[in-house]
C-alpha cells in the first residue's frame, strides 16, 4: 500500500491553478491542436504554465518578477527544455517518463499529456499515470480529445466515468482532465 500525499485545500488549489494553466483557452480555443503533435502542444502549454506559476510565486510574496520566473523555470522539468531531463521510472522492465514534472510547494507533480480519439489512447495515459503515481505526490493527466464529435470529452460526466475518475483521484492522487 502506498502512502498518499495529503490533499490539503492549499494543495488542491495549487493543482487547480496548474490544471487551468495547461488547459488555457489560448491553447485550446485558438490552436488547431488536432493537427499539432503532442510535442507542439506542449510547446504551446509551457509559456502559459510559466506565466501562471510566476504570478502565483509573486502572489506568495516574491516581489522580483524575474526572480519569480527563475524559480518557476527551475521547478519545471520537461523534454522541451534542453537543460532539464525528466527521470525514468522503471516498471516491469520498461522505462517510463512523464511529459513534464513540477517540484514546488514541497510537492512533486507529474504531468502526462495524451492526444487521441480512441479508448486505447485514453487507457494508455491512465496506465502511465498510475505508474507515475507511485513516484510522485500528484499526477495531472491531460487527455486532448481529437475525436470529431468530442465524444470522449462529452462522456466525462457519465456515472461510470465519474466513478473511475473519482477512484483515480481518491486512491492514486491522479487528476484527470480532458481538453
PLM regions with names:
Residues 1-68:
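Interdomain/boundary linker segments immediately adjacent to catalytic/signaling cores
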Residues 33-34, 43, 55-107, 119-121:
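Active-site metal-binding core of divalent-cation-utilizing nuclease and nuclease-like domains
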Residues 111:
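Conserved beta3 VAIK motif of the Hanks protein kinase fold
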Residues 114:
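Activation of the activation-loop gatekeeper triad in protein kinase-fold domains
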Residues 118-123, 133-172, 176-179:
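Nucleic-acid nuclease catalytic cores
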Amino acid at each position: 500500500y502506498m502512502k498518499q500525499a495529503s490533499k490539503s485545500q492549499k494543495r488542491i488549489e495549487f493543482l487547480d491553478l496548474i490544471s487551468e494553466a495547461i488547459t488555457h483557452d489560448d491553447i485550446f480555443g485558438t490552436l488547431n491542436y488536432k493537427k499539432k503533435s503532442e510535442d507542439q502542444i506542449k510547446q504551446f502549454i509551457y509559456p502559459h504554465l510559466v506565466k501562471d506559476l510566476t504570478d502565483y510565486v509573486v502572489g506568495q510574496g516574491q516581489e522580483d518578477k524575474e526572480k519569480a520566473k527563475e524559480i518557476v523555470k527551475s521547478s519545471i522539468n520537461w523534454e522541451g527544455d534542453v537543460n532539464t531531463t525528466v527521470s525514468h521510472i522503471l516498471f516491469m522492465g520498461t522505462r517510463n517518463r512523464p511529459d513534464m514534472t513540477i517540484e514546488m510547494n514541497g510537492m512533486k507533480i507529474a504531468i502526462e499529456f495524451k492526444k487521441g480519439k480512441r479508448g486505447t489512447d485514453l487507457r494508455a495515459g491512465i496506465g502511465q499515470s498510475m505508474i507515475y503515481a507511485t513516484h510522485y505526490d500528484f499526477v495531472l493527466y491531460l487527455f486532448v480529445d481529437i475525436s470529431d464529435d468530442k465524444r470522449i470529452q462529452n462522456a466525462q460526466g457519465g456515472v461510470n466515468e465519474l466513478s473511475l475518475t473519482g477512484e483515480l483521484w481518491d486512491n492514486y492522487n491522479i487528476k484527470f482532465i480532458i481538453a
